[in-house]
Amino acid sequence: MRTIIEGGDDCEVDPTRVAMPTMIATHQSNLRMYCDMAWTKIITSSSFFPSELQSVFSCFRGRCEEEQKADLSENLISASIFLRFLCPAILSPSLFNLCQEFPTDRAARNLTLIAKTIQTLANFSKYVHLLLHLKNSTFFIYYFK
C-alpha cells in the first residue's frame, strides 16, 4: 500500500479521465504492475488467514458439496473474502491500519482501480462495467485469458 500511496504513478485507464490519451498504455502498465504486487502480497499472506474464517469457509464448502454445488463454493468463498476483507483494505488502507495518512486523490483513484481489478479476478468475472475500456487491451487479456 505504501508504494502505491507514496508513488507518483498514475493508473488511470478511463479515456474520459486522462488528459493525454497517449499515456493510457503507460497507465495500463502501471495498473498491471500494482495489481501484480497486490496479488502477490495477498497470495503470500495466506498463512495469516484467521483459523476461524478457515473453519467457516471449510464448512461452507462442505455444505455446497453436499448440495452438489461444489463449483459454486469456490466462487462464493473467493468473492466473500475479497469483497468483505481484502478489497475494502485496498480501498481504505488507513481504516485498516495499513497506513496512517489518507491517500492523495490520485493514489485513492489508483487504489480504487486496483481494488476493482482484484475483485473482478476474485469473482472470476470477465470484466467490470466501469473497466470496459480495458476489454480490448493487452492488460485485459493478460488477466482474463
Residue ranges: model-predicted function:
Residues 1-145:
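Extended alpha-helical scaffold/tether regions of large eukaryotic proteins
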